UniProtKB/Swiss-Prot annotation:
Residues 1-231 are annotated as: tRNA (mnm(5)s(2)U34)-methyltransferase. One of its GO terms (molecular function) is tRNA (5-methylaminomethyl-2-thiouridylate)(34)-methyltransferase activity. This is tRNA 5-methylaminomethyl-2-thiouridine biosynthesis bifunctional protein MnmC. One of its GO terms (cellular component) is cytoplasm. Disulfide bonds: none annotated. InterPro entries: FAD-dep_OxRdtase, FAD/NAD-bd_sf, MnmC-like_methylTransf, SAM-dependent_MTases_sf, tRNA_MAMT_biosynth_bifunc_MnmC, tRNA_MNMC2, tRNA_S-uridine_synth_MnmC_C. Its EC number is 2.1.1.61, 1.5.-.-. Residues 256-618 are annotated as: FAD-dependent cmnm(5)s(2)U34 oxidoreductase. One of its GO terms (biological process) is methylation. The lineage of its organism: Bacteria, Pseudomonadati, Pseudomonadota, Gammaproteobacteria, Cardiobacteriales. Catalyzes the last two steps in the biosynthesis of 5-methylaminomethyl-2-thiouridine (mnm(5)s(2)U) at the wobble position (U34) in tRNA. Catalyzes the FAD-dependent demodification of cmnm(5)s(2)U34 to nm(5)s(2)U34, followed by the transfer of a methyl group from S-adenosyl-L-methionine to nm(5)s(2)U34, to form mnm(5)s(2)U34. The keyword Cytoplasm applies. It comes from Dichelobacter nodosus (strain VCS1703A).
Amino acid sequence: MLQTYAPIDFRNNDPYNTDFEDIYYNPALGFAESDHVFIAGNHLRERFSALPEYGRFTLAETGFGTGLNMINAAAHFLECAPKTAALNLISCEAYPIELETLKRIHHHWHHHELRIALYQNYPHRASGMHLIRLHPRVCLLLLWGDATRCYQACMARVNAWFLDGFAPSKNPQMWQPELFREIARLSQPNATLATFTVAAQVREQLTAVGFNVHKQTGFAQKRHMLSAVYERPLSVEKSWTDYPAPKFDTRPIAVIGAGIAGATTAYELAQRGKVVHVYHDPENPCASAVPVAVPFFLPGKTDTPMRQFHLAAWHDLCRELKCCPQGIVDRMPIALAVAEESLARRKESLADLFEPEQADIEAKKLYFYQAGALDTPRLLTYLLADKNITQYAQKIAQLTPQAEGWRIGEQIYARVVLATSWQEQLLPNALQKRMRTVRGQATFFALNAPVAGEIFCAERSFIPLPDRVHMHVGSSYSVNDCDRMRRTQDDAEHAEACRARFPQHAIQLERAFVGIRAASRDYLPLIGAVVRAESVYQRYQKWSKDRNIPINEEIDYYPQLYMHSGLGSKGTLTAFLGAKILAAMMLGDPLPIDRKLLTSIVPTRFLVKDIIRGHLNN
C-alpha cells in the first residue's frame, strides 16, 4: 500500500499542512522548541552522557513530520554519548513529506551530514518499515502508516518517547487508547515520555496505561507541557516467537559461513559496532559465489506473509544497493513474464505497491527498475572487508558448549551465528531436516553481437554481463541434489533456451557454474535463535488437539546461538533484511519488520507446525 503524501503549503517559507490546517513546528524557534519539550523533557543529554561504553538507547516518536526531532535527537546523542554507544530512533508518519519538499524545508537547517544520510535513503511512500543509517552509531526506523497500526507491528525496547503530532483537536484519529496501549507495551520500565499537549484525554490515557504524568513549563507561548515516567509495566503474554534477551558482551561474535547469508550478517553486526569473526570452509565454496545474480520477486495475487516479507526485503535491498561501490551493481531493468490474462490484475496490484518509477508493466512484462545484476563475488568481498570483520579459512565441524559460551578451536565466543547453508551438521537434529539441497547450474554464453541491457526472468534468467555480448543463462533447479559436477544436459537446455530467446544471434558456450543452495520447505528463510526442540514439544503439546488453546509459555533456546539460513534462490533478495532482523534480535535493537511475520521466519515455526499437524515423529 502507498501512503498519501502530506499536502504542504509554504507560508513565509515555513511548512504548513493544509489538511490539518497547522504548522509542523515553531517557525522561528523549531530546534529550541524541540530542545525544551522533547530533549529536556526526557532528560536526554544527561541520559546520553550516562550511557555505559557500548550502551544502546532506543527513542521513539509518534509523528516524524519534517524529521526535526529525530535529527535534533541524533545530534545531541553524537555530542553527549560515549563514542562506542549506539542510538536507535523509531518514528512513524501517516502522511510522509515528499523528498524534494523535505529538502526545501531543511535548506536552512544545521546537521548537514545527518540530513544527507536521510536524503540518500529516504523511502518512497510504501507503507511499512524502512531502516536508515543516519550515522555509524545512529539508526532510524521509519514507519510509514497509521501510528497505532505501525506500533502494533513494532517490536522494540523503548527508553524514551516523543509524543508528537498534530494536536488532538486537529488530528483526533491518532490520539486513540489503542496507541497508548502500544506505547506502554513497547516501553522499558522507567521509560520517559514528553509531549507538548496537556489535553485531559492525553493525561488520562497515559495514566491508564501506567505512566506517572506531570505538568511542566511549556515553550514560548504555551504555558504547559507534559512529562511522564512509565512506572506500572503491563503484563505481556509470552509467545513461541519471543526471542532471548540480548547478552551484553564485548567479545567477538562468530559467524560460520561466508555466503550471502553469512556475509550480510557479519556486515550488519560490524556496522553496528561489533567485532565479527567469519569462518568459511575452503573446500566447500558457497552457492553465493556464482559470478552474477539477480534479485527479483513476483508479487503474488494475495497479501501473504511471503509477499509481505519479499516486498520489505526488496525495499531494503534497493536502499543497500545505493551505497555499494561501483562495479557491484550493473543497473538495468529486471523483467518478468506476465500472462496476458493476468495483466490487468497485476497492473492494479502494482499500483498499490510501487511508484511508476519503481515498477511497471509494459508489453506483457513486469519491470522492476531500481536494482539490476549483482557481481556476487565482488559483493561478498565488499561486505567482508569491513574493518570489524576477520575471516578464517577453516572448516568448523563441531561447536562445544562452555559455561562462558561456545568453543570454536581455541577461541570461546559468547554468540555464534550459523549461516552454513545446506551443511547442517552443526544444527540440532530437530532443525536439520527443515531444509533441502537445491542444485543449480548456470551456463555462460558469448553472443556475436550486443544485446539490450535488460534482465529477463521466466523459467530461466537471462542476465547480460556488462559488455552485453556475454550472457548468463540459468539456473537449473534440482531438489535434494548436491552433486557439484557440471552436467552437459543442463548446458544443452540452457543453450536451447538462449537460442530461442535471441534467435538472431549466434551463441558459443564458454563456461558453467554449479552451486548448491539450501531452501527451506516453506520457501522462507530461517532467521533467529536456535530453539531447544523439547521445550516447544512439551509446552505447546496441547496444540496437537486444538490450535486455539491459549498457551502463555516461554520456550528455551541454546544460549546465544542463532541461525540465518534456508534462503534458497532468493538469497540476494532477502539476505540484507534477514541480517538486519537477526542483528536486531541479538543486540536488542528494534526489529525492522512487522512482528506478525516472525511466525513465518523464526526456526521454531517448523516445530510448532509439527505439533499442530501431529507430526512429532517426523
